[in-house]
Amino acid sequence: MKTRRIMAVVLAALMMLSIIPVAFAEEISSISADAALSVRMDDAWAAIELAEAEALADNLPASDVINAVYTAALNNENVDADSFSDFTADGFFFTVNGMHCAYNYRLRNKIEANVTEEGSVTFNASNGKVVEMRDATSPNVLLVGPYYGGYDPTFTDQYRREATSIAEATGGTLTILAGHDATGPAIAAAFPDKGAVIYDSHGIASGTSSYLCLTTNQGITNEDYSNGWAVRSGNEAFIDGRYIENHITSALDNPFVWMAICEGMKLSGRGTTGYALLRAGCGAVYGYSQSVTFVGDYKFEETFWNVIKEEGTIAEAYATMVDVWGPVDPYGDAWPIVMSPVDDFPANPDQAQTVYCDWTLFGESEEPIALEGYTLSANEANIAVGETVTVKFNREPEDANLYDII
């Protein structure tokens, strides 16, 4: 009997061992396939970066460096031969086994690599101030600065000061994701519990979307690249609004997203980033139709945010900004564009826009006061073609606001 029991236990164990490979076969296969994609991606970029390094060592001009990189990519077996697109003076886009990639000479070779890492920081700017929020349900502010810390010295402290002043006005905290700490996952994780989000970075449009440029590809997956909501650029990466939409893990607080990046609202991008951010739970999104100048954007943002900090609406802030500086970058050809639930992506973003969004960051809520009665200055009017008639609507009480006029 003892022998039989032992044999039974052994047989059961063997049966369990035979089941284990079946249970994990699909998962192992998936991991192996993903690892294989990573190898192909890394091999392709190794060849591209070798060609770039050799061209730079020969002191070739930018156009020749780009051509050398293009030739290397074209001849690499891992690069999809028919995938090259969006050729510009700075580079081009392509795919590796369907995963989106980009080579941009300017971003790769005009950016300082040897800098003191700055990292991220969160601090309370409220000084004990308590403010009643309106459309944004959080007083906190997020500033994303991938090139902060010296990666690109053309980025100043303008948005540090602005973001700090917004947090001081709302009585909230300010979180700054700087340099390599501005990873895709970190940005998505920081979106919840924010009333205002500011991108201060480079931007680029490709295919049918517009992207925020990062100085690191840390945490971005092959799935992200395959879906096109992330683009690999060597050790760097770009992400669009769909990346945020698909990586946030909790509900957003209806924030306003200010994108101080180039091409965030470019026509070819079709508003993909803006629509994705709205679907994710943002209240409104601001960006530019073309490459914007630093000085032009700074003038726009200061005027715009001053109105917002005075409890104005986005429509009021936009109108004031345009009245002061005009409807286009005073030093370039970028048009400021707002997307919101009542402001669709324009058919032509390279022209003046009328903004209707009444989103307000904070301010005292209007107490609802019921309409008890009303009178009209005229009960009827005969109006001929081309004529107008004024009929006054007198409320009882005069400050009643709880009613609809149909």
Question: How would you name each of these model-derived features?
Answer:
Residues 19-30:
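Sec-dependent signal peptide cleavage junction
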Residues 75-142, 266:
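Structured catalytic cores of large enzymes
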Residues 366-398:
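Short S/T/G/P-enriched beta-strand
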Residues 11, 15-19:
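Hydrophobic core
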Residues 37-56, 64, 70-73, 119-210, ...:
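A domain-level signal for caspase-like cysteine endopeptidase catalytic cores
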Residues 205-287:
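Cysteine protease catalytic core and zymogen-processing segment of caspase-like enzymes
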Residues 397-405:
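Extracellular acidic loop/turn motifs
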Residues 256-368:
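Active-site-proximal C-terminal subdomain of hydrolase catalytic domains
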